[in-house]
Amino acid sequence: MTRRPLLILLEFVLITGPLTWWWLHGGLESYYEIFQRLGFPLLAEMGVNTFNPGLVKDRMINFIPFLGLMLVTPGLGFVRRFVGLAVGMLLIFLSHVLLAYWAWASFERDGQAADSMAQFFPGLLLADAFPFIIWAVIANRVLAEMISNIMPRSASSTNSQSD
């Protein structure tokens, strides 16, 4: 039996709602402490000597939709789901490090210029999209099957099947 889309949406909200509340009430600060311990040394190796956390901290919440999508996607095997979660979380952490570097390169390294935000904006878009891209890569077979079930078959494929 397949799960209906509204049930999947409800499961997603039931998972991400409490996680978002937790994130806004202390989770971000806990994660930021981990980011300082693990991410700052990486940033220092990349030449970052000053850091404005306000440019990056708000984007760090993107763990939550990734986690929710990975948990509610039907048809993912246990191993693929578990390994996907682990690898995805690591990649999202590294994307936060790269976004911090991009912020530094856009605003701090060369001084704040009129085009600093224009240089930084693509990084924000990539940071927001990255968890969804990782999820789509991990769940590609499931997504392809779902899409093939809802897309009408073209006339040429229908004709070739009847021949």
Residue ranges and their predicted role:
Residues 19-28, 94-106:
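C-terminal TM-helix exit segments that contain a strictly Trp-centered aromatic cap at the helix terminus
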Residues 83-94:
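Central hydrophobic cores of alpha-helical transmembrane segments
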Residues 2-31:
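N-terminal signal-anchor transmembrane alpha helix
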Residues 2-3, 74-84:
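Membrane-interface helix-boundary motifs at transmembrane edges
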Residues 30-51:
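Extracytosolic (periplasmic/ER-lumenal) interhelical loops and adjacent juxtamembrane/interface segments
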Residues 100-156:
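Alpha-helical transmembrane segments of multi-pass integral membrane proteins
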Residues 54-78:
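Hydrophobic alpha-helical transmembrane segments
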Residues 14-18, 61-70, 130-136:
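Hydrophobic alpha-helical transmembrane segments of multi-pass integral membrane proteins
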